[in-house]
C-alpha cells in the first residue's frame, strides 16, 4: 500500500509539476495573446475609426464615381464628336450646295451675257431697221411732197387752160380727190406702221436694257455670295479642325485620367491583397495560438479531471455515499448512459465525480465557462477515457428536450450526445438559456470556432453524431437561420420549454445546493455580476470575466473550503444563483414588458441597446426567450450558435467545475492552497466586486456604459487575480467575437460565421472592429446619405439603398428584438422608416437609438419602470404609449426639426434678404403653431371666442411647456440627433437655397421676359388680349418647360430632401412632443384622453402625421399632380409605392382613407381630425405647424418648382378644369372642393407666385401700371385695359389654378358666368366682372343689398352684376386670396419697405415691376406731397402685386385672354393676380407654404375664419369699391388703410357680429375721416382726401386707388368707376357665374371682382356674408347694417365649424347663387377653400389670434407687420391665391384678393396683404414706403391701438371677425378704412396673424 501510495504520490507530484508547467505556458500564452490583442488594437486605432476596408471601399466608391464621371464625360465627348461630325457633314452639304449655286450662278451669268449680246445685236438690228424705215419714210414724204407739188402745179396750171367742157372738169376733180385721199391714207398708214414699229423696237430695247442690268446685278450678287460661301467654308473648316483637335485632346486627357484611375485601382487592389495576406497571417497566428491554448486548457482540464477522480476515490465515505447518490441519481444517470466518453466529457466527469456532480451541475447551469467548455471539449477530443468508470454507450433515444435543444441548435455534439438524457437536456437548456445571454455572441463565434474543432473532435470522439456536429460546425449560422426561419414558432415553444426546464433544473439544483451548505452571498454576488453583466452588454468581456469569475470564484472558494465546503458553496450558490437568476429573469421580463409597453420604438432603435437588452433578457431564460424569440432571425441565429457554444462551454464548465470539486483531499488541498495563495482576497474580492458589479448593474440599467466600465475594471481586477486569465481571455475574446457577431448581425452571417469558425480571438476582435467599422461605415453612409440626401438622386439612391440595407438590418434586429413589444410600432416605424427615402430609416433609427438609449436609461430608471409598471398606464397607455412614444419620438423631433427647418427657412429667407420677415414669420409660425391649435379647438368648441382665448392660453402654456419640454428633450436629442439632422438640414437649406435661387433665377428670367413682354404690353395695353395671351402663353410655355424641368428636379430633390426631413422632422418633433407630453403632466393628463383620441386619430390622421410625406405628398401630390399632372403623380406614386411597400399596413389602413379622404382629411381632418389631434396633442399641434414649416421650407422648393411648374400647372389645370370639376364633384362637393380648391389654391398660389415671379409679375405689373396710369385718366377704360392685360394673366393663372379650383367648385358656374361675364365683360368689362361677382353676391343674395349700400352706381352695376353676387363670393375667395396676397403683397411691400423683403420681392417679383414698384414705392415713400407718386407707388405696388399676380396671372395667362374682354376684368384679375401674384411671387414660399401648411392645418379648423377671410376679401372688394367711392380709403387705405385696416380689423372684432356693421361703419367713417386726414398727410396735398375716400375720378385717387387697386386697382378703379359696375355686378351675378363657369373668364371675374369691390362697399359685407354667412341676407346692406354677420357669419360659423360651409362653398362653387345661398357663395366657398387652403394660414392665424401678436407687432411696426403679414400673408395669400386659383375664382378671388388686399391692408394679415397686395402693396411697395410711412406710421399708431384691441378681439372675435367680416363689410361701406376695420377684425386679423406669424 505504501509503495502504491508513494507511487501515486509521485505520479501526482509529476502531474502537479506538469500542471504548473502547463499553467505557466498558459499564462505566457495569455500574456502573448494580450500583447497581440493590444498590438492589434493599436493597429486598428491607428487605422482610424473606419477600417482599411471602409477606406478602401470609400476610395473605391469615389474612384468608381470618378470613373463613371469620366465615362459620362467620354460619352458626352463622343456625343459632341458625333454632333460635330454631323455639323461637318451639314457644312459640307452646304458647301456643296454653295458650289452648285455658284456654278448655277456662273451659268446663269453666261446665259445672261449671251442674252445681253443677243439683245445688243437685236438692238443694232432694230436701230438699223428704224433708220431704214426713217429713210423710207423720208423718201415717201419726199415723193408725197413731190406728188403734191406736182398736183398743185397742175392745179395752178388748170385755170390758165381754156376751161374744160363743163362735164369734163367735174370728173377730173373727184378723181384727183380720190387719188389724194388714197395717197394720204396710204401715207398715213405707212407712217402709223413705221411709228408702231419704232415704238415696239424702243420698248424691246428698254426691256433688253433692263434684262441686261438684271443680269449684271445677278452676276454681281452671285459673285458676292460665292465669296461669302467660300469664307464660310473656310471658317467652318477651321472650326472643324479646332474641334477635332479639342476632341483629340479631350480623348487623350480622358485616356490619361482613365489610366491613372486604373493604376490607382490596381494599386489599391494590390494594397488590398497585401492587407488581406497580412490579415490572413495574423489570423493564422492567432488561430495557432488559440489551438495551442485550447490544447493546454484541455490538458489542464484533463489533469483536473484526473485529480478530481482521485479525490473522489479518496474522499470520505460520506462523499462516497454522496457520490453513489449522485451517480445513482436517475436524473444524473441518463447523462452518462447514452453518451460515449469521447462524445461528452461532461457525462464522463459527472460519472467520475458523482459526488460533486449535484453541485457542479447547477453550478455549471449558472456558471458560464466558455473557456472551460472549449477546453473540456478539446479534452473530450484528446481524452478518450478520462475515468476508469466505464460509461456504457447507449444509443441516443430521441428525447423531447433533446429535440427542443436541437431545434434551437443549442448544443452541438454535447446536446446531441446527451439529448436523450432528460436531466442533461434540462441542464443543457437552462445552461443554454442562462449562458445564452453571456455566450450569445461568443456562442455565435464559439459555434463558429468550435464547430470546426468540435467537428473534428466529434468525428473522432463522437462517432454517433459526427455529421450532426459537422453540420453544427459548418452550417451553424445557416442552420440557425434556416431552422429559426422554419421553426420560429417551434423555437419559441422550445425556448419556453427550455425556460421551464431551466427553472426546474435550477429548482432541483437549488434544492441540492440547499442540502449542502452554500455560501449563497458569494455565489449570489458572483451570480449577480454574472447575470447583471450578461444583462449589461452584448457579451462583453466583463461578462466573460464574470463567467470565469463565477467559475473561478466558485472553484476557488470551494478550494478554500473543504471539498464538502466546495460542494456546499457550489450547490448553495447554485440555488441562490438560480434564485437571483430567477429574480433577475423576472425583473428582466418585467423590464422587457416595460420596454415592450413603454419603449417599443426604443427597442427598435438601438441595435446596441437592443443587443444589451437582448443579453439582459437572455440571461433570464423567460425574458431571454421572449426577447430572444422576438429577436430577428439574425440575432437568433447568432443566439443559437451562442447557445450551442454556451451549452458546450457550459457542459465543459460543468465537467471542470466538478473537477476541482473532485480533487483528492491532499492534492485538492494543495491546489486549494495554491488557489488561496493566488486568490486569498479573491473570494472576498469576488463578493465585493460582485456586489459592486451588482450595484453598477442596477445603476447600469440607467447607465449601462458607466457600469460596464466599472464592471470591466472589476472584472479586470478579478482576471488579474485569477490564475485562469488565459482561459478567460479566450472566453472574453470569444464573447467579443460573439458581440461582434451580434453587432454584425446585420452583416452577412456567413462572414461572421467564417470568422467565428476561426477560433482566433484576434479575428474575433478584428471581426468585431470590422463589423463595428462596417456598422460605423453604414452609419456614416447613412449620415452621408442624410447629408447627401439633397445630392443627386442617383447617388442618394445608391446610398439610400445602402442605408436601407443597414437600416433594414438594424431595424430588423431592433424590430425583431422588440417584435412582440413593437410589432405594431416596429412595423409602422419600420414601414415609416422604409418610406420612400430609406435614409429616413437611418436617421430615424439613429434618432430612435439615441432616444432609445435615453429612454432605456429613463425606463431603466425606477421612475420609468414605475411609470411603465403602473397598471393604468400599462393597460390604458400600452397602445397609447406606443403611439405617444412614437409621437414623442416624432413630435419632439418635429419640434426639433422645426427649429432647424425654421433655421433653414430663415437662411433661405436671409438668402432672399428676408431674414427679418422669415424670423417674424417663424415667430408668427410659432405663434401660429400655438394659435393654430386655437382655431382648431376653436372650431371644436362651441364658444369659438372664449374657447379660442382659452385655447390660446392653454396652447400657449402647452406650447411653452412643449417648447420647454421640447427644449429639454430636444437639447439632448438634438445633440444626438442634430448630428444626423443638422447636416441634412444644412444641406437641405443649401439645396433649398439653391433651388430657391434657381427658381428665383427662373422666375427672374421669366420676370425679365415678362417685363419685356409687359413693357410691350404697356405700350400695347389696349391691344387685343389675344396677343397678350399668346405672348404670355409663349412665355408660359417656356417657363413651363423651364419650370417643369427645374420644378421636377426641385420637386424630386426637395421631396427627397424634405420628404425625409419632413418625416424625420415630423417623427423627431413628434417624439419630442411625445416626450414633452410625457414630461408635461398637464399634457399627460389632458392628453391621456387626448392620446386615446390622438391615437385613434393617429390611426386615422397620424398616417398623415406619421407619414407626413404620404398624406402631404398625397394631398400636395394631388395638388401638384393635378397641377403638374402625371409627373408629380408619378413621383407621388413612386413615393406612395415606396411608402406603401414600407408602410403597406399604414397606407393600406391609412393611405387608402387618406387617398379617399385625403383631400377631405387635408382640409377636414387637418381641420377636424387635426383639431382634436392638435387639441389632444399640443406637441403634435406644435409639430404640425412645424411640419407645415418644413413643408414651408419644402414649400419654398415646392413653391419654386410649383412656381416653375405653375405655368405647367396652369395649362394642366386648364385641361384639368373639366376633370377637376368632375373630380371635385365626384368627391364631396364641399370637402373635395375645399380640399382640392385648397390644394389647387396652393398650387395656384404657387403657380401665381411663379407666374408673378416669372411672367405676370413684370408684364401684369407694367400693364397694371399702364392700366393704373390709364385709369388715372380714364379709370374704367384703363381698368378695362389693365384688367384685360392683368386679367389675361390673372385669367391665365385663374384658368390654370383658379381654373382648377373653380373648375372643381365653380367650373360650370365659371363657364356660365364667364360666358355672361365675357359678354358683359366685352361690353362692360367692369360691370361684367362685377356682375360675375355680383352673381356670386346675388346668388348669396347679399351682394345686391351691399350694392345698394355701396353706391347707386355700384347698385346699377350690381344690377348688371346681379350675377356678380356669385362673383362676390368669388371675390370673397379672391378677397381671401387678395387678403392672402395682400398679406403676401403686404409682406412684399413691407419687403419693399424692408430692403431684405424688397430684395426678396425683387428676387421673386423683380420682373413684377420691381422697378415700378421701387419707383412707385419711392413715390409712395415720398409722402402725401407725392400722393400722385404714392398713387403711382400704389400703382407700382399694385403692379408689384400684379407682378406677382402677373406671374400668377401669367399662370393665369387665360386671364389675359379674358383681359381682352375687359381690362377691368383684367384689373380685377390683376387685383386677383396681384393677390395671387403676391401669393405667387411670395418670396417666402417656404414660410408661405409653412404658413400655408400650418395655416392650412389651422385652416381646417378655421372654415369660419375662411369665411371671415372671404368677408375680408369682400371688404377688400368693397374697400376697393369704396376706395372708388372713397378715394381716401384707398389713399389712406394704402398708407393708413393697412394701419387703420389693422385698427379697424382690431376694432371690428370688438364690434362683434352685429356691432361691427354699425360700429365699424361709424368707426370706419371716423377712420375714413382719420384716413382722409392721414391720407391728406400721406397723399400729396394736391390729392383731396375725398378723392381717396370717395372720388374715383380724382386722378390722385385714381393713381393711389388704381395703383393700390392695381392688384385691386382695377377693382378699385372699377370700384371708383366700377363702383357702379359693382352694383351692376350685384345685379349681374350671372355674368360672374358665367365668368366663374368660364374659368378663364377671370377678367370678367376680375371685373366682377371690381364690380363686387364696387359692390363690396356694401358688397364686401356681401362677400363677407357670402364667405362668412354665405347667406345673401348677410351680404345685404340691412344685414351689414344690422351686422349681417349674424346671418352670414352665423351661417358661416355653423357651416365653417360643421363643414357645412365647405359643403355650401362647394355647392356655391358649383352654383354662384348657391354659393351665396348655400351658406357660402362660390367666392365664399372658394374663399373657404382658399381660406382652408390658403386662408387657413390667415384663418388659422386669425383663429389662433396670432393676429393679436401680429397686430401688436404690426401696431408697433406696421411696415414690419406688413412684411411679416406679407410673409404670412404671402403664405396665406399664396394659399388664398392657390385656393382662389383652385377655386377657379382666381380672377374673382384675385379681385377679391385685390379688394381683400385693400381690406387686408385694413386687416393686419389680409389688410396688410391687401395694403401690400391689393392697395397697400402699392402702398407698401410705393406708398407703404411713402404713404405707408405716412399713413402706416399713423396707421401703425392706430394699428397699435386697434391692433392690440383687434388682436384681443381677433383672439376672441377671430371667429367673430369671421362672423363679423360681413358686418365689417358694412363698415366697409363707410369707407376703405371700414373694410380695413372689417378685414382686420375678421380676415385681416387672420391675415395679420398669419402675416405676423
UniProtKB/Swiss-Prot annotation:
One GO BP annotation of this record: neuron differentiation
The entry's keywords: Acetylation, Coiled coil, Developmental protein, Intermediate filament, Isopeptide bond, Neurogenesis, Phosphoprotein, Ubl conjugation
GO MF terms, alphabetically ordered: CCR5 chemokine receptor binding; intermediate filament binding
Cross-link (Glycyl lysine isopeptide (Lys-Gly) (interchain with G-Cter in SUMO1)): 1136
Linker 2 as annotated region, ranges: 194-196
UniProt biased composition (Polar residues): 507-517, 1815-1824
Entries under InterPro entries matching the protein: IF_conserved, IF_rod_dom, Nestin
Stretches the record annotates as Coil 1B: 56-151
Biased composition (Basic and acidic residues): 572-595, 606-615, 634-646, 670-681, 717-730, 761-774, 802-818, 846-879, 949-966, 989-1051, 1198-1212, 1241-1253, 1354-1363, 1393-1403
Biased composition (Acidic residues): 1458-1469, 1561-1576, 1688-1709, 1773-1788
Region described as Coil 2B: spans on this chain: 197-314
Residue ranges, annotated region (Head): 1-7
GO CC annotation: cytoplasm; intermediate filament
Residues recorded with modification N-acetylmethionine: 1
Region (Coil 1A): 8-43
Family: Belongs to the intermediate filament family.
Quaternary context: Forms homodimers and homotetramers in vitro. In mixtures with other intermediate filament proteins such as vimentin and alpha-internexin, this protein preferentially forms heterodimers which can assemble to form intermediate filaments if nestin does not exceed 25%. Interacts with FHOD3.
Biological role: Required for brain and eye development. Promotes the disassembly of phosphorylated vimentin intermediate filaments (IF) during mitosis and may play a role in the trafficking and distribution of IF proteins and other cellular factors to daughter cells during progenitor cell division. Required for survival, renewal and mitogen-stimulated proliferation of neural progenitor cells.
The name this protein goes by in its record: Nestin
Organism whose genome encodes this protein: Rattus norvegicus (Rat)
Lineage: Eukaryota, Metazoa, Chordata, Craniata, Vertebrata
